[in-house]
Regions:
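Terminal low-complexity tails and localization/encapsulation signals of metabolic enzymes
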Residues: 1-34, 67, 71, 121-147, ...
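Histidine- and aromatic-rich ligand-binding microenvironments
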Residues: 6-7, 22-25, 31-45, 193-197, ...
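Generic alpha-helical secondary structure signal
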Residues: 18, 41-49, 78, 82, ...
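An amphipathic alpha-helix/helix-turn recognition signal
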Residues: 24, 41, 45, 60, ...
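Glycine-rich loop-to-alpha-helix module at the N-terminal edge of alpha/beta enzyme cores
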Residues: 30-119
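Rossmann-like NAD(P) dinucleotide-binding subdomain of oxidoreductase/dehydrogenase enzymes
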Residues: 121-252
Length: 252
C-alpha cells in the first residue's frame, strides 16, 4: 500500500517514529493508501528548507521566475489526467469534475506567470525640498497555506503560485483525507525547475496546523474552509504577528 509522505526540500524526508492515518476511496470505502501525520518538528524542517531557498529564489530576475511559472503551467496541463485520477480516487468526484477543478486552478497559474514583471516600484522626485520618494515591493519570506478536502488541486493553486511568483517560499498543508494529488503537484513544481525548498508540503492534522500558525519564521497564512476553523486560524495566526487571510463559509 502506498504512503503519502511530506515534501520537504524536494524529497520525502525520513522522519523517525512517524504515525500514519488511512485514506479511503469514498465510492467503495476501501483503504487506498496511508498518509504521514506531521508534527511540529516536521513543520520546522520545512521552514528551514524554505528559509534556505528564499535568497536564491527571491533574488532571481522577474524574467527567470516568469519563465519557470510558464513551465509549471505547461507541466500541469500535460499531466492533468494523472492529477484528476488521484482526485477521483480519494475525493470521489467524477473524472470530468476533477478536470474542471484543475482547469480553474490553472487560470490562477496563468495569472501568476505575469506577476513577476508587474512588481515595479515607484519614484517621485522633489516631494520636499531636496527630498525624493522611492518605494519597491519585496517578498514577505515564508508563507503557508491550509487547504480543504473539497478542492485538493484548485485551492492550492489559488495560493502558492501567486506567492512564489512574487518571490516568496511556501509551505502547503492539504487535507489529510485526499493529499495524493496535491503531493504529485509539488513534484511538478520541482520538475518545472523551481528550486527545492521554494514549495514544501506538510501532511497532518491539528498539530501540524498549530505549528504553522505559531512558527516565528512564517510571515503569512492563507486558509480556506469552514467558518469556525477560519475564525480559529485567523485569531491564532494573528496572535503570533502573521498576516492572515482566512476564507470561511465553505460548506460543500
Amino acid at each position: 500500500m502506498s504512503l503519502v509522505d511530506h515534501f520537504i526540500n524536494g524529497n520525502g524526508p525520513n522522519f523517525k517514529n512517524i504515525s500514519t492515518t488511512a485514506i479511503y476511496n469514498p465510492a467503495s470505502g476501501e483503504e487506498v493508501s496511508r498518509v504521514v501525520s506531521g508534527t511540529a518538528n516536521c513543520v520546522d524542517e520545512a521552514v528551514k528548507s524554505s528559509l534556505k531557498a528564499f535568497p536564491e529564489w527571491s533574488g532571481m530576475t522577474p524574467l527567470v521566475r516568469s519563465r519557470k511559472m510558464f513551465k509549471l503551467k505547461e507541466i500541469i496541463e500535460k499531466r492533468q489526467n494523472e492529477l484528476a485520477k488521484l482526485i477521483t480516487l480519494e475525493h470521489g468526484k467524477t473524472f470530468d469534475d476533477a478536470l474542471g477543478e484543475i482547469a480553474r486552478g490553472l487560470e490562477v497559474v496563468e495569472f501568476s506567470c505575469g506577476i513577476p514583471n508587474h512588481l515595479a516600484g515607484n519614484f517621485t522626485s522633489n516631494v520636499g525640498r531636496s527630498i525624493d520618494s522611492w518605494s519597491d515591493y519585496q517578498p514577505m519570506g515564508v508563507c503557508a497555506g491550509i487547504t480543504p478536502f473539497n478542492f485538493p488541486i484548485m485551492v492550492p493553486l489559488w495560493m502558492f503560485p501567486v506567492a512564489i511568483a512574487c518571490g516568496n517560499c511556501f509551505i502547503l498543508k492539504p487535507s489529510e483525507r485526499d493529499p495524493s494529488s496535491t503531493r504529485l503537484l509539488t513534484e511538478m513544481v520541482l520538475e518545472a525547475g523551481i528550486p527545492a525548498g521554494v514549495l514544501n508540503m506538510i501532511n497532518g492534522g491539528k498539530e501540524a496546523v498549530d505549528a504553522i500558525l505559531q512558527h516565528k519564521d512564517i510571515s503569512g497564512v492563507s486558509f480556506v474552509g469552514s467558518t469556525p476553523i477560519a475564525h480559529y486560524v485567523y485569531c491564532e495566526a494573528a496572535k503570533y504577528g502573521k498576516k492572515v487571510q482566512a476564507m470561511g463559509g465553505a460548506k460543500n
